[in-house]
């Protein structure tokens, strides 16, 4: 693909040049080619976007629930019509296989938008009787202008997960995509405008997180920030949001999730789940089950089943329908993953497979890392303690149920957890003791629109998806009505 035209900001229903004068490049990680130069939003651009959003939000909130619902449903239709085009762009920008982006990224994002479009008319207040002459009623009102700050692994899906409930509740959103993968969020802005969203209700500001993102978190005109990213960055976003104007926040942060295989489990099923929990999207999924706990007596058999499945991984041309494994999202990220792999070897973990870059025709110019499985791991190893966010699985053994629950919970993270067992009593007994916000039994990874997702501990605050997220983009106003004559003590 030839280099794209320089990408601008999207403010008030159209493209506009950044006043900062700064730019950055977005790279195709499969081959290292520059896809486009992208303009970076500065402080003045954030001010412009907030002013635009304030204007648009008033128009948007004044529409009826059914009017807003119809506009968002039109956006859903356009997303599905343009699925292949958007998936190709997402593949170029992220490196993910087209077999994945064409069936997951836009599809699941559109599902979430459709879900919230249907919920808009159900946003209701309540009535509370006090006495014969008085009652209270409540209204759910939009927050106003909110900000979404996205991660690089699911660019358009994250933009939809954040904008769908925000817009459904009557807010305007300013979205800052990751500077690593900024392209499809701009296309989403076009789609919202085409669907009839008032100008300013969805503005997109590409830029560097430390600058553009910080300006958004500090801006007094923004009522809430929804952030997806790492723990350290999340803490900064939360601190800035609180210090500036006590903004509400939703934080979807990192994870180091446990997958527990019990001795009664079907090991073929367990191996299939472990593969999806570690190598889907080349391991760049925040909920990945990278700590795989296996009974000591099952270790050898389980290792062989994992090795057999690694052989089925198909890396290569990301647009080949048979390819199911792409490069990492960027060269700096690849280098970071390789540092973790080196650390694992240094600390005594045994490499069962992988452990290096992929080499050969088609790989040498890209950010490719081989699917890697470490065994003979211990809980104190760096690769077991820290989030790697790449195709690196760590196998650990255990002896008892109590032991594995304790070890699974021995982490600052609490995003996800899963178990594989044939015993449903055990399944529920154990899952209720795991300190994680998203849990799976005999499956892994699905996050449908109806399911609230978010983390415990350092893995986040608040939830995305589900009814409660729509409510989190509103504020409750209580109104007391008195029909009897008011009595003053003065």
UniProtKB/Swiss-Prot annotation:
<feature type="binding site">
    <location>
        <position position="254"/>
    </location>
    <ligand>
        <name>NAD(+)</name>
    </ligand>
</feature>
<comment type="function">
    <text>Involved in the biosynthesis of the osmoprotectant glycine betaine. Catalyzes the irreversible oxidation of betaine aldehyde to the corresponding acid.</text>
</comment>
<feature type="binding site">
    <location>
        <position position="246"/>
    </location>
    <ligand>
        <name>K(+) 2</name>
    </ligand>
</feature>
<feature type="binding site">
    <location>
        <position position="27"/>
    </location>
    <ligand>
        <name>K(+) 1</name>
    </ligand>
</feature>
<feature type="binding site">
    <location>
        <begin position="150"/>
        <end position="152"/>
    </location>
    <ligand>
        <name>NAD(+)</name>
    </ligand>
</feature>
<dbReference type="InterPro" id="IPR029510">
    <property type="entry name" value="Ald_DH_CS_GLU"/>
</dbReference>
<keyword id="KW-0560">Oxidoreductase</keyword>
<keyword id="KW-0479">Metal-binding</keyword>
<feature type="binding site">
    <location>
        <position position="93"/>
    </location>
    <ligand>
        <name>K(+) 1</name>
    </ligand>
</feature>
<dbReference type="Pfam" id="PF00171">
    <property type="entry name" value="Aldedh"/>
</dbReference>
<feature type="active site" description="Charge relay system">
    <location>
        <position position="162"/>
    </location>
</feature>
<feature type="binding site">
    <location>
        <position position="26"/>
    </location>
    <ligand>
        <name>K(+) 1</name>
    </ligand>
</feature>
<feature type="modified residue" description="Cysteine sulfenic acid (-SOH)">
    <location>
        <position position="286"/>
    </location>
</feature>
<feature type="binding site" description="covalent">
    <location>
        <position position="286"/>
    </location>
    <ligand>
        <name>NAD(+)</name>
    </ligand>
</feature>
<feature type="binding site">
    <location>
        <position position="460"/>
    </location>
    <ligand>
        <name>K(+) 2</name>
    </ligand>
</feature>
<dbReference type="InterPro" id="IPR016161">
    <property type="entry name" value="Ald_DH/histidinol_DH"/>
</dbReference>
<dbReference type="InterPro" id="IPR016162">
    <property type="entry name" value="Ald_DH_N"/>
</dbReference>
<keyword id="KW-0521">NADP</keyword>
<feature type="binding site">
    <location>
        <position position="457"/>
    </location>
    <ligand>
        <name>K(+) 2</name>
    </ligand>
</feature>
<feature type="binding site">
    <location>
        <begin position="176"/>
        <end position="179"/>
    </location>
    <ligand>
        <name>NAD(+)</name>
    </ligand>
</feature>
<dbReference type="InterPro" id="IPR011264">
    <property type="entry name" value="BADH"/>
</dbReference>
<feature type="active site" description="Charge relay system">
    <location>
        <position position="464"/>
    </location>
</feature>
<dbReference type="InterPro" id="IPR016160">
    <property type="entry name" value="Ald_DH_CS_CYS"/>
</dbReference>
<feature type="active site" description="Nucleophile">
    <location>
        <position position="286"/>
    </location>
</feature>
<feature type="binding site">
    <location>
        <begin position="230"/>
        <end position="233"/>
    </location>
    <ligand>
        <name>NAD(+)</name>
    </ligand>
</feature>
<dbReference type="InterPro" id="IPR016163">
    <property type="entry name" value="Ald_DH_C"/>
</dbReference>
<dbReference type="GO" id="GO:0019285">
    <property type="term" value="P:glycine betaine biosynthetic process from choline"/>
</dbReference>
<keyword id="KW-0630">Potassium</keyword>
<protein>
    <recommendedName>
        <fullName>Betaine aldehyde dehydrogenase</fullName>
        <ecNumber>1.2.1.8</ecNumber>
    </recommendedName>
</protein>
<keyword id="KW-0520">NAD</keyword>
<feature type="active site" description="Proton acceptor">
    <location>
        <position position="252"/>
    </location>
</feature>
<dbReference type="GO" id="GO:0008802">
    <property type="term" value="F:betaine-aldehyde dehydrogenase (NAD+) activity"/>
</dbReference>
<feature type="site" description="Seems to be a necessary countercharge to the potassium cations">
    <location>
        <position position="248"/>
    </location>
</feature>
<dbReference type="GO" id="GO:0046872">
    <property type="term" value="F:metal ion binding"/>
</dbReference>
<comment type="pathway">
    <text>Amine and polyamine biosynthesis; betaine biosynthesis via choline pathway; betaine from betaine aldehyde: step 1/1.</text>
</comment>
<comment type="similarity">
    <text>Belongs to the aldehyde dehydrogenase family.</text>
</comment>
<keyword id="KW-0558">Oxidation</keyword>
<feature type="binding site">
    <location>
        <position position="180"/>
    </location>
    <ligand>
        <name>K(+) 1</name>
    </ligand>
</feature>
<feature type="binding site">
    <location>
        <position position="387"/>
    </location>
    <ligand>
        <name>NAD(+)</name>
    </ligand>
</feature>
<comment type="subunit">
    <text>Dimer of dimers.</text>
</comment>
<dbReference type="InterPro" id="IPR015590">
    <property type="entry name" value="Aldehyde_DH_dom"/>
</dbReference>
């Amino acid at each position: 693909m030839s280099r794209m035209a320089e990408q601008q900001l999207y403010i008030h229903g159209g493209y506009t040049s950044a006043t900062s004068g700064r730019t950055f490049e977005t790279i195709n990680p499969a081959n290292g080619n520059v896809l486009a130069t992208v303009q970076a939003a500065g402080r003045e651009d954030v001010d412009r976007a907030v002013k635009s959003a304030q204007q648009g939000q008033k128009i948007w909130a004044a529409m009826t629930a059914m009017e807003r619902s119809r506009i968002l449903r039109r956006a859903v239709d356009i997303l599905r019509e343009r699925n292949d085009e958007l998936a190709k762009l997402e593949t170029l920008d992220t490196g993910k296989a087209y077999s994945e982006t064409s069936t997951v990224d836009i599809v699941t994002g559109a599902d979430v938008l459709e879900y919230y479009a249907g919920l808009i008319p159900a946003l209701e207040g309540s009535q509370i009787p006090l006495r014969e002459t008085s009652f209270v009623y409540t209204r759910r009102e939009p927050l106003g202008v909110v900000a979404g700050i996205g991660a690089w692994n699911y660019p358009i899906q994250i933009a939809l997960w954040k904008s769908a409930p925000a817009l459904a509740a009557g807010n305007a959103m300013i979205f800052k995509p990751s500077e690593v993968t900024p392209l499809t969020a701009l296309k989403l802005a076009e789609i919202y405008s085409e669907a009839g969203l008032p100008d300013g209700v969805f503005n997109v500001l590409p830029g560097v997180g430390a600058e553009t993102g910080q300006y958004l978190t500090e801006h007094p005109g923004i009522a809430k920030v929804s952030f997806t990213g790492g723990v350290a960055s999340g803490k900064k976003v939360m601190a800035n949001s609180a210090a500036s104007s006590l903004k509400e926040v939703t934080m979807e942060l990192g994870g180091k999730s446990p997958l527990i295989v019990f001795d009664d489990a079907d090991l073929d099923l367990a191996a299939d789940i472990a593969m999806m929990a570690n190598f889907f999207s080349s391991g760049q999924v925040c909920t990945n089950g990278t700590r795989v706990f296996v009974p000591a007596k099952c270790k050898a058999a389980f290792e062989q089943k994992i090795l057999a499945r690694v052989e089925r991984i198909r890396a290569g041309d990301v647009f080949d329908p048979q390819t199911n494994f792409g490069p990492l999202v960027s060269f700096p990220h690849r280098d970071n993953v390789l540092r973790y792999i080196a650390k694992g070897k240094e600390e005594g973990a045994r490499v069962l497979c992988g452990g290096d870059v992929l080499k050969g025709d088609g790989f040498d110019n890209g950010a490719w890392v081989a699917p890697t499985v470490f065994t003979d791991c211990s809980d104190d190893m760096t690769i077991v303690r820290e989030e790697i966010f790449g195709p690196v699985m760590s196998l650990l053994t255990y002896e008892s149920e109590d032991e594995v629950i304790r070890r699974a919970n021995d982490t600052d993270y609490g995003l996800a957890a899963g178990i594989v067992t044939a015993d449903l009593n055990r399944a529920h007994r154990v899952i209720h003791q795991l300190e994680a916000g998203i849990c799976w039994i005999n499956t892994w990874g699905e996050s449908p629109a109806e399911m609230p997702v978010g983390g415990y501990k350092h893995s986040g605050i608040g939830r995305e998806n589900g009814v409660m997220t729509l409510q989190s983009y509103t504020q409750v106003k209580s109104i007391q009505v008195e029909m009897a004559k008011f009595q003053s003590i003065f």
